[in-house]
Amino acid sequence: MSRIRIAGTQDQPLWDDFVLSQGQGGPYHLFAWKRAVEQSYHHETRYILSESDQGTVLGVLPLVLIKPPLLSSTLVSLPFCDYGGVLSPEREVSRELLEHASAMAASLNARLELRYREPAPEVSHVCGLGMTSQKVRMLLDLPGDSDQLWGSFKSKLRSQIRRPQKDGLTFTMGSHDLLDDFYTVFRVNMRRLGSPVHARAWIESVLDAFSERARVGVVYSGDNPAAAGIILICRDTATVPWASALSEYARSSPNMLLYWGFLQHACACGCSGFDFGRSTPGEGTYRFKEQWGARPSPLYWYGKGLPDSGVPAKNGGNLRKRIESVWSTLPQGVVDHLGPLVRKYIPL
């Protein structure tokens, strides 16, 4: 027999031990993501676990309720990242967790959205959700050390990595001590891209919650930050959820040094895999990650109204481009204030 219940703070050790034991478990499944969401954006969380009569965890499903003012709510697994979804080695347990999530979404009058890094047809069968797969993660296998990795690169890539170093740029790894410099780069770059920026408090909460698993990397030109990113370590994989570079330093390619620093760190931590994060096939970030040898791995997002197709709606894409165009022209101070107020309700 098994039972399903909502996990509490006291369940973090059990939850995390289970996540770390599962091949599909990643940093976003950890309890740290729940803590960061609650601490910074104050969203309600529903972390569901299935356990045996003896208290053994059989499966988990992390969920966050996004309730924007005047708009419909979304119960999502998980927001602000690439994937979440059910973790369980047992098909029946997975089905029970999905049924529970579907009933919960109905009781909350919320749209259910579940994100996976592998196909999960049971989501469509149990919850009646459509699927889209227009985004991919870019993954790179890592050798035993960074010297071997360097030797595997083509000469052109090695030259691109050396370029910022020849221009005097330097890479530094830290934590909260580099948060201000990270956020300086991040907020300016998000405005350039036409996207509302996450609150500084969100990034700080991620660093707080993930502790030693999270690190900040910054590339400097003199005393000025030119590129910056966050890296998370979970099991044998290093993941980069956010990275940015300032356009005025583009000639020196600081992002090349940033990612090389992250790759060295991942190798030093004993990681065998590197997740460059989400991209759209064929776009600029996809090609940037591809040059490192990364291969695409499709993401599978399930939700009401989603087509079983990787093709986004044309009109929706055009509207988004218009909004991005307008946002990028607003004064930096305006988007710095408005961005976090909007971004907390955008689960992407």
What are these regions (language model features)?
Residues 2-54, 61-71, 117-251:
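A conserved beta-strand-loop-helix scaffold within acyl/acetyltransferase catalytic domains
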Residues 43-45, 107-111, 269-271:
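Short, high-confidence coil segments that cap the C-terminus of an alpha-helix
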Residues 47, 65, 119, 123-148, ...:
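Active-site/acyl-donor-binding loops of N-acyltransferases
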Residues 49-52, 60, 68-70, 81, ...:
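Aromatic (often tryptophan-rich) hydrophobic motifs at membrane interfaces
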Residues 76-83:
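N-terminal cap/recognition module
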Residues 78, 151-160, 314-322:
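Short intrinsically disordered coil segments
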Residues 86:
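Active-site phosphate/ATP/adenylate-binding loop shared across adenylate-forming ligases
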Residues 94-95, 105-117:
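Short secondary-structure capping/junction motifs at helix and strand boundaries
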